Amino acid sequence: MSVSGYPRHRPRRLRSTPAMRRLVAQTSLEPRNLVLPMFVADGIDELRPIASMPGVVQHTRDSLRRAAVAAVDAGVGGLNLFGVPRDQDKDATGSAGVDPDGILNVALRDLAEDLGDATVLMADTCLDEFTDHGHCGVLDGQGRVDNDATVARYVELAVAQAESGANVVGPSGMMDGQIGALRDGLDSAGYADVAILAYAAKFSSAFYGPFREAVSCSLSGDRRTYQQEPGNAREALREIKLDLDEGADIIMIKPASGYLDVVATAAGVSPVPVAAYQVSGEYAMICAAAANNWIDERAAVLESLTSIRRAGADIVFTYWAADVACWLS
């Protein structure tokens, strides 16, 4: 029993029914906000499950086409492709990524033909999947990543991906000057309409672990000389501003859940859309907890994605994109 006139403010009034909660919801989660990362492997004739990411697979070309159409039909906003070449096709400079007949470029052409303007087709513009050393760039004589040689290679990758039908290229290697160089290279090659998704703040994270299996990466060492330190928020803001100055069309924060402060900061300063990537480790943690019946998988997924949206992400990359689209329909 309450004292007359107290409490005057009762926020619970706006939580009283599902209809009321929907009406006053401040954050929405819709399939159109989501991008589905997909892996396509060369030299396989059936799906290859990724053990550390239950439910995620390396696709064949044919299975990729079917899964992509299904995701788009479900309402997923975009698709982001990663190519996985055969081990014997990897080399020091990632030639398979530039080759028009390389698995990623062939798969881009497949999906561009199948889907046309029904989706936004994105490509990972990086070398780690294609190099025999597993780094995101070209190495110099001392085994260090050569920034400028790598950027030149990224331009070749981006042009090859644009030629193959990518609407958006995503340089994810965190090289200095990569966005400006790609913009110049794409424009010079006649692809002024191809957008650049800049991985503006990509942190050196332990949560990328399962992804290395997903792309069959052979990395030795780490990527701390080019990916950002997890504790450096002001450095992230500097990187964001540099990429915006160089012409980024969309900026990416990666990973998402551990860096929601950076997502919020980016959303506060960016005149272009902000994306955030719910990475493989985030996915694997929820899967593992759900498999042990410690959490409700669907509820946890929707809560995590809503949190990323609440922080300010316009676009969320998630391996649950197709599932969520079905759940929300």
From Swiss-Prot:
It catalyses: 2 5-aminolevulinate = porphobilinogen + 2 H2O + H(+). It comes from the Bacteria. 5-aminolevulinate 2 binds at S280, Y319. Mg(2+) binds at E239. Pathway: Porphyrin-containing compound metabolism; protoporphyrin-IX biosynthesis; coproporphyrinogen-III from 5-aminolevulinate: step 1/4. Its EC number is 4.2.1.24. One of its GO terms (biological process) is protoporphyrinogen IX biosynthetic process. Disulfide bonds: none annotated. The keyword Lyase applies. GO terms for cellular component: cytosol. Homooctamer. Belongs to the ALAD family. Catalyzes an early step in the biosynthesis of tetrapyrroles. Binds two molecules of 5-aminolevulinate per subunit, each at a distinct site, and catalyzes their condensation to form porphobilinogen. This is Delta-aminolevulinic acid dehydratase.
